[in-house]
A protein has these predicted regions:
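HKD-type phospholipase D/PLD-like phosphodiesterase module
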Residues: 121, 126-171
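PLD-like (HKD) phosphodiesterase/transphosphatidyltransferase domain
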Residues: 47-126, 214-217, 224
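Recognition helix of helix-turn-helix/homeodomain-like DNA-binding domains
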Residues: 1-17, 39-41
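HKD (HxKxxxxD) catalytic microenvironment of the phospholipase D
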Residues: 160-199
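Short acidic-hydrophobic, aromatic-tinged amphipathic segments that line or gate anion-handling sites
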Residues: 60-67, 162-166, 200-201
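DNA major-groove recognition helix of helix-turn-helix/homeodomain DNA-binding modules
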Residues: 19-35
């Protein structure tokens, strides 16, 4: 959260404020997010999050990934201030549906954001198995290969770190600063049809830590992508 972000809030009363930024601002000012943005936050939810961080929490859940608006994905990545961590198998939708997705990552890296991108290795047993489980055969392999080929020319770009992994993914995660989009994977169902949770670090620190630890374990065992082009 920086001065530019606060200015956007002041200039546009209907600006969609990210959960983590709203709670951070409320903590600094000694109030609740509802006090600052009554149209975006319910009183009970805001107080529950502020006073009971270790108990049940309220987060945004979508029944499928396709229900999360494209604009929400775009703003999620565009707002990055310190770090972006992406853990996926193929995620070709990022390149196909988010206008200028790669440019957004490159711009973030150029301004000092540390970007880490974990993409599935198309030539591994885990990728082949996922295609069999989803009933689409080699389509998953082709998608992984497409994403790798799109990323490869940018491997080695300062601030943009890309690695390939061979793990079985139970969740795909898209962390930007203190907000994470979590795409669960249900057996036999493609990612686009599976639930998505939008989670703030402040919602449930233990769950956040578990997801971060999973990313770290996969990152440590992954292989750096070799630059092409």
């Amino acid at each position: 959260m920086d001065v530019k972000t606060v200015r956007r809030w002041l200039a546009n009363a209907t600006y969609k404020v990210r959960d983590d930024n709203a709670h951070r601002a409320a903590e600094v000012l000694g109030c609740t997010p509802h006090d600052l943005w009554p149209n975006q936050f319910q009183p009970s939810t805001a107080r529950a999050l502020a006073t009971n961080p270790g108990g049940p929490f309220t987060a945004t859940l979508y029944a499928s990934r396709t229900q999360l608006p494209i604009t929400a994905w775009q703003q999620h990545f565009a707002d990055a201030a310190t770090g972006i961590d992406i853990l996926v198998l193929a995620a070709t939708f990022l390149f196909d549906t988010l206008d200028g997705f790669l440019d957004t990552l490159l711009a973030a890296a150029a301004r000092g954001v540390q970007v880490r991108f974990l993409i599935g290795d198309p030539d591994t047993a885990a990728t082949i198995l996922r295609g069999e489980e989803e009933g689409i055969g080699e389509a998953v392999i082709a998608r992984c290969r497409t994403s790798v080929e799109l990323l490869a020319p940018h491997a080695g770009t300062p601030g943009l770190h890309i690695r390939t992994h061979d793990t079985t993914l139970y969740t795909s995660t898209f962390r930007v600063d203190d907000t994470m989009i979590v795409n669960f994977h249900i057996y036999g169902s493609p990612g686009r049809n599976n639930p998505v949770l939008v989670l703030s670090r402040h919602h449930e620190p233990r769950l956040w830590a578990t997801l971060e630890q999973a990313f770290a374990h996969i990152w440590d065992s992954a292989n750096p992508l070799i630059r092409k082009g």
